[in-house]
């Protein structure tokens, strides 16, 4: 389930560190979090959709790796991001 272009743009403007920023860890993690949220809602309705469940697990793993990278590089940015996204860590 891909994100809508409008949703993507709002996430980019909200989490970008500078103008035209689409690849910073903050933006990538925020986009992954939105996709995870959407897939979780989908799986509440379609409990036996195992292909989507596997995709969800891949997204969670990718977000976890990016969070680990951000924590190693800059702890303050990491803490600010998990607080803004409301992630438990």
Curated annotation (Swiss-Prot):
It comes from Beutenbergia cavernae (strain ATCC BAA-8 / DSM 12333 / CCUG 43141 / JCM 11478 / NBRC 16432 / NCIMB 13614 / HKI 0122). Keywords: Ribonucleoprotein, Ribosomal protein, RNA-binding, rRNA-binding. One of the primary rRNA binding proteins, it binds directly to 16S rRNA where it helps nucleate assembly of the platform of the 30S subunit by binding and bridging several RNA helices of the 16S rRNA. Forms an intersubunit bridge (bridge B4) with the 23S rRNA of the 50S subunit in the ribosome. PROSITE patterns: RIBOSOMAL_S15. Belongs to the universal ribosomal protein uS15 family. Part of the 30S ribosomal subunit. Forms a bridge to the 50S subunit in the 70S ribosome, contacting the 23S rRNA. SMART domains: Ribosomal_S15. GO terms for cellular component: cytosolic small ribosomal subunit. GO terms for biological process: translation. It holds the Pfam family Ribosomal_S15. This is Small ribosomal subunit protein uS15. It comes from the Bacteria. One of its GO terms (molecular function) is structural constituent of ribosome. Gene3D superfamilies: 6.10.250.3130, S15/NS1, RNA-binding. InterPro entries: Ribosomal_uS15, Ribosomal_uS15_bac-type, uS15_NS1_RNA-bd_sf.
């Amino acid at each position: 389930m891909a994100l809508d272009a409008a949703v993507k743009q709002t996430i980019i403007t909200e989490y970008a560190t500078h103008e035209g920023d689409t690849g910073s860890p903050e933006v990538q993690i925020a986009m992954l979090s939105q996709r995870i949220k959407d897939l979780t809602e989908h799986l509440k309705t379609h409990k036996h959709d195992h292909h989507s469940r596997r995709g969800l697990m891949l997204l969670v793993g990718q977000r976890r790796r990016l969070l680990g990278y951000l924590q190693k590089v800059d702890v303050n940015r990491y803490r600010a991001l998990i607080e803004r996204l409301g992630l438990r860590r």
